[in-house]
Amino acid sequence: IPAGQEGPPPHIHPLQDEIFEVIEGKLELSANGKKIVLEEGQSYNVTANTAHSFLNPLDRETKFRATYKPALDIDYMLVQGFDSLNSQSNPNQPSLQMIVDFDFILKQIHGQYKFAGAPGIIFTIFAAIARLFTKPKVKSLKDHNASF
């Protein structure tokens, strides 16, 4: 994760634990309102159904590994999500296309990932409006799985 960058807004994996392991640098996690700072070699297990977010507090890149148990369809969400993110001219300012793509991805994985609190409500409203102007450009779960 680049210097000073935040991960996704507070979110929940209702069916999965997410284990964060810092390989290089430092990672700040927020889980259920509690701040956890992880240094190189440290790990933390965010249990299923726990609202969490993370950021890199350093002025240099942080490398970390996130493991999901069980994996379910996380590979689909990450591959298609990063494809959408990387296709944006400014990934720090979500476009209508990116919002529609993420809305489509979340519908494909049926409740395996959801935004926590207000960001979820705001996202739902923006996605409904954005769908009036554009269609998703990411693969469906079925097409993604067929490509392996």
Language-model features, listed with the residues they occupy:
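Jelly-roll (double-stranded beta-helix
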Residues: 5-10, 14-16, 29-148
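Structured binding elements
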Residues: 20
